[in-house]
Amino acid sequence: MMSYSERLGGPAVSPLPVRGRHMVHGATFAYVPSPQVLHRIPGTSTYAISSLSPVTLTEHSCPCGEVLECHDPLPTKLAQEEEQKPEPRLSQKLAQVGTKLLKVPLMLAFLYLFVCSLDVLSSAFQLAGGKVAGDIFKDNAILSNPVAGLVVGILVTVLVQSSSTSTSIIVSMVSSGLLEVSSAIPIIMGSNIGTSVTNTIVALMQAGDRTDFRRAFAGATVHDCFNWLSVLVLLPLEAATGYLHHVTGLVVASFNIRGGRDAPDLLKVITEPFTRLIIQLDKSVITSIAVGDESLRNHSLIRIWCHPDTTEASTSMSRVEAIGSLANTTMEKCNHIFVDTGLPDLAVGLILLAGSLVVLCTCLILLVKMLNSLLKGQVMSSRRSSTQTDFPAPFTWVTGYFAMVVGASMTFVVQSSSVFTSAITPLIGLGVISIERAYPLTLGSNIGTTTTAILAALASPREKLSSSFQIALCHFFFNISGILLWYPLPCTRLPIRMAKALGKRTAKYRWFAVLYLLVCFLLLPSLVFGISMAGWQAMVGVGTPFGALLAFVVLVNVLQSRSPGHLPKWLQTWDFLPRWMHSLQPLDGLITRATLCYARPEPRSPQLPPRVFLEELPPATPSPRLALPAHHNATRL
């Protein structure tokens, strides 16, 4: 029988360690080859292990520290499949080419439906909560509080699922004199945070595979982390110094800015012919309620009568003004599904919400599957090229900024940062785009959506142009300031590290993604809003201890991972606390028991899944070909 080393084609390897020319006697142990080597040996196989336990052999003076390795079985699996496949015949090649050519228009069709479903989803949220959003904006006394204004911006943008809608309401209130520019800046910051919830929801659709879900959720939440970190720095700075207000005021005063054309509707030209057959909204009702026009309180958001030539002529004015201006023209009923149903806005909104979510999820799942099949043999080469396609050596640093330009340009074309970031989220999950590349693309997307707002502000009347343009510039300079804070130096790119940590946590506990959405975009903003309503004394009394505790925990976590020797021994880990205070494992057990309490247990196959985490590995049995001594605490295969 051939020995293991002879099957490798190399010299025999002693089962005992050798120091110099002398063999060290002691317990035998095996030298573990890499997965790539094992795949070349007939009759052997490897399992993907996300992390390896530390191996310490003190009796042989071979101490090994902690090892953290991540073996992705995809490269070797693809290589094996390519080697084992027979050479296809000409007819098979033609069939494969025809199938791939057929998948391209299908992918474009699913992408079109995906974008349309996002538009309908935004309309559904506006029908369900649009008037509530207008009422929130109406209370100017609340919005004068910067923290309350920030929370209002988050909640309203989450409600209407469109930062463009919330920003247009803010611009209308500022231009009408109901809201000062300084009070509107925190709301702009909040709308920047609220718009990132869409791609986070899209990432949930890839929860079936832990590795893909980890990458997709990290790529989606890097936008959230950037926005939250920017707000934590720039909101106190703005409240103390008025930085954005003064800078944008100087820019507006320095240039002779004149009104221009509306922002181009490049994407809506393609999507509106389909979405207008489903629903048409009169968004001026929300704006009118926000500016205090109670005459439209009982009007429906669903558009009934349309002008045959300019169906959107009344979007920038109230319904009463629109009817007055079009009194001498012919009006006709709008052509969409809900024009004659007589259903209330809330019912129509819930119907559209359910339908658009079903279409969105279906299109996304089919897009991911088709991308997988098209890129199956090229995913790894794409992943390698995505990390190596930098500019030549002296200009390597320009690559990220070029990605920002690409992200800004694409967002300007589609006129929606949510659409762009939601479109690249599945690619991040598949590994085609790395999170290091997705980060500058997302930052460029933030810039692209602000340029659209600037062009829209230039279409304002001359007497209202200054204030509306200043608000649009505040949005622009907020994102520019965030980029200067969190991108130029590699050590300052904290959003990437935070997003990766969230991705790992979510891949291990998939319910954590839903908890993250509820806490960050609903519960935490609502709690802060309620405390801010009690006055600044309550905010200081509650916020100061909480902020100090959060800063202490972050500092200790950094020292525990980087320099534990500088901490007292009892503080080098969190084990002195109850387990539920520093681990999600107890909560995960409760959720698992709650969800599976009525499920009938079924026998499971002993075969391991293709990708498993160390916490999920069953007790390992020694391999018959690589037998390890039972009394050694060696690495499990």
From Swiss-Prot:
The chain crosses the membrane at residues 104-125, 146-163, 166-185, 346-368, 411-434, 465-485, 512-532, 538-559. One of its GO terms (cellular component) is basolateral plasma membrane. The modification Phosphothreonine is found at T506, T621. It catalyses: 3 Na(+)(out) + phosphate(out) = 3 Na(+)(in) + phosphate(in). One of its GO terms (biological process) is inorganic diphosphate transport. Residues 126-145, 186-345, 435-464, 533-537 are extracellular. Glycans are attached at N298, N328. Belongs to the SLC34A transporter family. This is Sodium-dependent phosphate transport protein 2A. It comes from Mus musculus. The gene is Slc34a1.
